């Protein structure tokens, strides 16, 4: 049997008074998801193990069945893989947002919806004027710092010999909060450090890494304020992309491919606009399919993603489709948009995939070949909180001939009564691979 996972990032939520105590999933018009839940089996899944941040890098890796205690190295290395940066043993790669600060507070984690073409100009500017800053070079050595352009506001910072034992604060978890108390700090892990270590690019201590990152943050604000892009934004009274914000870093991970973990998977593909998910896919040995017009926002090319998934299922036996839009709506606190993204996912992506799977000869060429569909979010991104929440998420599993349970619609409340009950982490993939 072939398998497709369709993941609506941050799609789950909490009850909202404005919706008479319903969640966006309960309120949204999503007949295909409800049909799959009614005809399939449902449950809830713990996607964030104790002690880990409730981020997409954690939850999506766990959903694919990996042991986070063995493979987790943060977002940075995964996004490096997607961008095509080959990490060395001494590299420390960390996600680097370009964000908006106003009046001493974090206003947006996305630099005022910074576009990739503008971001590329700013990243080049930072490489020329910040990575080569005389004070940085004098203190930490030449070639220590490199910025790498990603997509929109999501970029990468690589520090040769950086130390991962630091405490960072994701900017999307702290909207409207003062930024200075959120600067990087070291974990309480230290070791002796000397000039010879610096010259051979051995690892900095946690304290030195934190100090370097904080210095880069402060200097970036001075530089970005002077850039013509932000000066024009200021004239128009628009939000500026006026600070870098590094978070979630690590070293090069060691991961088995999905095919090594699950022998029944012979080949697979991942479809996502997000570097992080593409990076997980690369380490998992999945083929990366990039869809034109896939933005990671509500205006993404749902139909293009659906068609790409249908084509992938003709040749691969595992497809992972990730849609970011509902997460961004949650971070923006936009209830109406979050509901729309759920409905778009249902009608513009899941519906055509379901119709292709159930159409005779469209995907499956023989009567004994079937496709199993799973739908779930990775975590909650409640619109009233605007941050990630690591509570259990609802999931459904459907295929022709599955024995349905009593769940009648797909949402956080209904799936509590699903026949799978409450699963933990890798148990989801185990359940999926039973078919």
Regions found by a protein language model. Give the residues of each.
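Feature captures the catalytic ectodomains and active-site-proximal regions of enzymes
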Residues: 1-435
């Amino acid at each position: 049997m072939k398998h497709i996972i369709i993941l609506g990032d941050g799609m789950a939520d909490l009850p909202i008074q404005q919706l008479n105590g319903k969640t966006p999933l309960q309120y949204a018009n999503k007949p295909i998801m409800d049909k799959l839940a009614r005809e399939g089996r449902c449950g809830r899944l713990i996607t964030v193990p104790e002690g880990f941040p409730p981020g997409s890098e954690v939850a999506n890796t766990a959903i694919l069945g990996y042991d986070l205690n063995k493979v987790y190295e943060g977002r940075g290395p995964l996004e490096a893989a997607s961008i095509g940066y080959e990490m060395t043993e001494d590299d420390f790669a960390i996600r680097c947002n370009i964000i908006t600060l106003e009046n001493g507070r974090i206003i947006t984690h996305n630099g005022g919806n910074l576009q990739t073409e503008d971001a590329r100009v700013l990243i080049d500017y930072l490489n020329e004027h910040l990575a080569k800053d005389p004070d940085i070079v004098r203190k930490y050595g030449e070639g220590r710092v490199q910025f790498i352009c990603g997509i929109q506001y999501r970029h990468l910072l690589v520090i040769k010999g950086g130390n991962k034992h630091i405490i960072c604060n994701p900017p999307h978890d702290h909207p409207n909060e003062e930024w200075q108390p959120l600067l990087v700090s070291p974990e309480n892990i230290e070791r002796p450090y000397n000039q010879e270590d610096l010259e051979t690019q051995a690892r900095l201590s946690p304290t030195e890494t934190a100090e370097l990152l904080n210095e880069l943050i402060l200097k970036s604000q001075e530089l970005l304020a002077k850039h013509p892009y932000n000066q024009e934004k200021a004239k128009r009274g628009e939000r500026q992309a006026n600070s870098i914000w590094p978070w979630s870093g690590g070293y090069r991970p060691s991961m088995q491919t999905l095919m090594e973990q699950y022998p029944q998977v012979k080949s697979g593909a991942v479809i996502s606009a997000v570097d992080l998910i593409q990076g997980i896919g690369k380490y998992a040995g999945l083929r990366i399919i990039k869809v034109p017009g896939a933005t990671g926002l509500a205006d993404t090319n749902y139909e293009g993603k659906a068609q790409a998934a249908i084509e992938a299922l003709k040749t691969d036996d595992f497809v992972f489709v990730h849609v970011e839009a509902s997460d961004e709506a949650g971070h923006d606190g936009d209830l109406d948009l979050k509901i729309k993204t759920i409905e778009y996912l249902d009608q513009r992506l899941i519906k055509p995939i379901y119709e292709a799977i159930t159409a005779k000869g469209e995907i499956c060429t023989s009567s004994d070949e079937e496709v199993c569909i799973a739908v779930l979010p990775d975590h909650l991104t409640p619109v009233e909180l605007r941050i990630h929440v690591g509570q259990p998420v609802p999931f459904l599993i459907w295929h022709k001939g599955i024995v349905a349970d009593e769940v009648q619609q797909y949402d956080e409340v209904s799936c509590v009564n699903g026949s799978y009950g409450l699963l933990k982490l890798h148990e989801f993939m185990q359940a999926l691979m039973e078919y």
